[in-house]
Amino acid sequence: GTISNENFEFEVSDVQKKLGDLFAHYGKVKKGSIKLNDSVELKIDTQRRNNIRAYHSATHLLHESLRRVLGEHVTQKGSLVQSDRLRFDFSHMKPISEEEIKKVEFHVNSIIQKKSDVKTRIMTPKEAVENGALALFGEKYGEEVRVLSMGDEEGQFFSTELCGGTHVLNTMDIG
């Protein structure tokens, strides 16, 4: 998106929540300059935002699918989510076979096609783990966490993880 006025334009490439309700906007000044107390207009690039939502949500389905196909030892080691692609880094002891890749793809696509609502709840980290949420060990969590649940599977969620990111409202919105 952009932050701009008649004398200034800033192209936003990333937004991150910092302390409380403080959000940091990262990007580049495209023209002009800005002074303290200047009025500005904020515009969201909705297509980019929707793409990032879809890819970010897909990482959760991919993670759980990998765990179901390859084993529960699989853990996320990192990811890159952009408006045109995603990369998902994970632990596993050996190369993945073509058959395993097909099974993972099948799991992800079947959950997307079920058109399940994506649910978020706020709870304590202890409650989240008791409710089956997958937490990344080594991460520090506050008194409350956001729990994301996706893909209703016969009364159970396909994926439940702690996550504060932006997500689709329904798995079908992934694409």
Language-model segments: which ranges?
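A glycine- and charged-residue-rich anion-binding loop/surface
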Residues: G1-G175
